[in-house]
Amino acid sequence: HGMTEGNLKKRYIGTTDEDLINTDCLKGDYPKCERVVASPLKRCIQTAEYIYPNVDIEICDKLKECDFGDFENKSYEDLKDNPDYQKWLDSNGELPFPNGETHEDFKNRCKDGFFESLTERDTAFVIHGGSIMAIMQKLFGGNFYDYQVKNGCGYEFEMRNGEIVDDYSPIGCG
């Protein structure tokens, strides 16, 4: 999705429903599609409407960003002296977010939402950075953070009958 105020201020923005603040990062080349699936949060819907103005948007709740719990809408500066945050950092992000989602539950939710949304039609998924990383790791392996993307960026790959038939390539970020 495009840039939000929380992204600009480097906050953990998961369940907070923020609007886009600009579309500058959405000037890249995006693949044509017959359908769009998006997270229900405004930043994804607004991005989908901007990139694909003539395509109906289908909503998938399971593709929402992670629930960051007590870290939600806070920055590193806000959290750096919090012992729970330090424990989470020391775990390489594997510990559950206090009063939020576990990393594994989040990744499984995103994977399930992705596969439930697949059809034989060319589909663009307009979702969150964390959701992209979760799906890519589940599909292609490797480290979760290997798939980190900037706002407006993502990956393109081909699947048939639920199977990957082509390696991924980066998209967006003109």
Regions found by a protein language model. Give the residues of each.
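Short active-site segment of divalent metal-dependent hydrolases/proteases
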Residues: T4, S131-I132
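Active-site-proximal alpha-helix that buttresses catalytic centers in soluble enzyme cores
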Residues: G2-V55
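Domain-level recognition of soluble alpha/beta enzyme cores
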Residues: G142-D166
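Acidic, His/Gly-rich catalytic cores of divalent-metal-dependent hydrolytic chemistry
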Residues: Y168-G174
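Phosphate-handling substructures
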Residues: I51-R109
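Short, acidic/turn-prone active-site loops that include or flank metal/cofactor-
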Residues: D17, K62-E65, N151-G154
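Generic beta-sheet signal
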Residues: E34, T119-G130
